[in-house]
Amino acid sequence: MAGNTIGQLFRVTTFGESHGLALGCIVDGVPPGILLTEADLQHDLDRRRPGTSRYTTQRREPDQVKILSGVFEGVTTGTSIGLLIENTDQRSQDYSAIKDVFRPGHADYTYEQKYGLRDYRGGGRSSARETAMRVAAGAIAKKYLAEKFGIEIRGCLTQMGDIPLEIKDWSLVEQNPFFCPDPDKIDALDELMRALKKEGDSIGAKVTVVASGVPAGLGEPVFDRLDADIAHALMSINAVKGVEIGDGFDVVALRGSQNRDEITKDGFQSNHAGGILGGISSGQQIIAHMALKPTSSITVPGRTINRFGEEVEMITKGRHDPCVGIRAVPIAEAMLAIVLMDHLLRQRAQNADVKTDIPRW
């Protein structure tokens, strides 16, 4: 009921708030015998970590993860893995002025309507700080998928504001602060971010995540279709307002003769479906996109009300990302990895003995 857990066989439960003592999660369903250290998780956490560039929030959290359980002598035991990250750079005083004010565009109003109270410090549980634990759990899934099945999961920024980005060079993604795969657009992104900082405003973004090497057959029709669970996972990320699989909404303008992915003896001739047909993976690349809204934490004055119903004007103080899509890349990778690992374990549990003579590419 509380909505803090995702997955069925590979289950991730997170806890913690933005300005609490710590963030944590419990990861169930990890097979025994996997080599696992804190360093295996730290790489992706460092990619998501705040304060790593001038384009993201200057809250400086080391995000050093601790493995509390489920690993003995560097090997998973098959029991629950407990993970913890301590919060070290909270500045709760930045939020004392808004404890009775609902920030427009944030979850303040809805959390108070639901629970009758809220942790106003940095958004509490609704803060994207919670996603650090998703990234830690997702790193376990990414390691297992890569080592046992050769599955690779990569994400990148594919649009910021009105600047579209082409996936020209995956190796470039880790070499610039925008997770940008398009060398021709990095200067334009830098210029846009500088302008936003000067204006005190923010901008939306689009993130694309791709999984390669996924075997055919993952997905549980009808309600646990693979694309449905991917959409569920990506939509659960803060600020995400839309998810597309494959060509997504672009299929509206296509005809069936254009959209169908024809098959020859050499394999699929296109991938408009994004690697999923009938809710089941086809063996092609799984491609998903998500749209993230511009954060409402800006210094441009805006109208709202306080808890007494009085209209007030407010400016959001604190340290915030002018484009939340940048740090969402490793989060999207983690959520896709969590879903794929869960479905892979479910497929093996039910259909491990299934053999077909149908070609696979």
UniProtKB/Swiss-Prot annotation:
- State the InterPro entries in the record: Chorismate_synth (IPR000453), Chorismate_synth_AroC_sf (IPR035904), Chorismate_synthase_CS (IPR020541)
Q: Please share the entry's free-text remark on the cofactor.
A: Reduced FMN (FMNH(2)).
What GO biological process term is on the record, naming one? Answer: chorismate biosynthetic process
Pfam families documented for this protein: Chorismate_synt (PF01264)
Q: In which pathway does it act?
A: Metabolic intermediate biosynthesis; chorismate biosynthesis; chorismate from D-erythrose 4-phosphate and phosphoenolpyruvate: step 7/7
The cofactors it requires, by name, are:
FMNH2
Which positions does UniProt annotate for FMN binding?
A: 125-127, 238-239, 278, 293-297, 319
Q: Binding positions for NADP(+)?
A: 48, 54
* UniProt GO molecular function: chorismate synthase activity; FMN binding
Keywords for this entry?
Amino-acid biosynthesis, Aromatic amino acid biosynthesis, FAD, Flavoprotein, FMN, Lyase, NADP
Q: What is its EC number?
A: 4.2.3.5
Gene Ontology, cellular component aspect: cytosol
Reactions catalysed, as given in the entry: 5-O-(1-carboxyvinyl)-3-phosphoshikimate = chorismate + phosphate
Which SUPFAM superfamilies does this entry report, sorted A to Z?
Chorismate synthase, AroC (SSF103263)
Reading the lineage from the top rank, the first entry is Bacteria
Give the quaternary structure. Answer: Homotetramer.
Q: What does this protein do?
A: This reaction introduces a second double bond into the aromatic ring system.
Family label? Belongs to the chorismate synthase family.
HAMAP family named among the record's database cross-references: Chorismate_synth
Q: What is this protein called?
A: Chorismate synthase
Organism in which the protein naturally occurs: Shigella boydii serotype 18 (strain CDC 3083-94 / BS512)
Lineage of the species this protein comes from: Bacteria, Pseudomonadati, Pseudomonadota, Gammaproteobacteria, Enterobacterales
